[in-house]
Amino acid sequence: MNPGETVLPPQLREEIALLAVYLLSSGRGLLEEPADYGIYRCTDGARRALQLLDEHGGSTARLTAVRERLDEVMFAPMGEDRDMGAILDDLCRQMADALPEIETP
């Protein structure tokens, strides 16, 4: 490790590794699952990443709002009629607006 670098807390390191496992296994599952599943797997991956930021103090109000909307989408009853394209377009715009607020070292 170089001077000035920080070590990730063990819990955060584990959670990031678990997110990577989720994304990899989701990619593998897409080879055999219906195509529509991909939308939800990618959406859930984004939700999980934003949840990590929330849990470890790295989020902003705008990012939390995106994660909360993703929670609503992911935990809604199956078969509910919704326009995922419009929802994801809106969330992408919200993410783009939120990115400048993120502090970088």
Swiss-Prot record:
Membrane-spanning parts: none
Q: Which InterPro entries match?
A: DUF6092
Q: What is the disulfide pattern of this chain? A: none
Q: What does this protein do?
A: Involved in the biosynthesis of albonoursin (cyclo[(alpha,beta-dehydro-Phe)-(alpha,beta-dehydro-Leu)]), an antibacterial peptide. AlbB is essential for cyclic dipeptide oxidase AlbA (CDO) activity.
How is this protein named in the record? Protein AlbB
Q: Can you name the source organism?
A: Streptomyces noursei
Q: By which gene is this protein encoded?
A: albB
